[in-house]
Amino acid sequence: MVQRWVDQPGDVLDDTEVPDEEPDAGPDLVDLLPAGHVPPGFLPVLQAYDYAGDEVTLVHADDARLRRMAVFDVLINNADRKGGHILAGVDGGVYGVDHGVSLHTEDKLRTVLWGWAGKPVDDDTLRDVAGLRDALLGDFDQTLRPHVTNREIDALYARTVGLLENPVMPSPDRRRPIPWPAF
């Protein structure tokens, strides 16, 4: 068996290497913060109590990369976008971990990225949504068919059309707005 450890920022492999700079201190892209302490550049999602009984606020960064992920989640009807499924890469990218709890024909959107609820979708993102709609009318649906059902493709198409006709981020379902646990 061969195993390779993936070096992390700040790791030092031997005495000759200089450690990487420490990452900036501050909240993660999605985080729990003490109630009333939402820093600039972050959007509150909900108020809750932590395991110690203290009030906390679930927040996420007001970041264009996360906003695009939130739109993607709306389109694919992601039922499981947890905070731990959003990774900040050392390359500056933001990556979503998805495992197939999406593309359902019934509305099942559950995400921690509700900070933009009720806000308009930006024009650049709408152009991409229109591109997806057009691709689904072309050959892209044939690429998807071996992997998802016709009904799921039809639902995806309907969500693209719906977002283009009403380019506003949806509001959460009051019954089950976020996946649990949130991280």
What is each of the regions a protein language model found here?
Residues 1-183:
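Phosphate/dinucleotide-binding and metal-coordinating scaffold of catalytic cores
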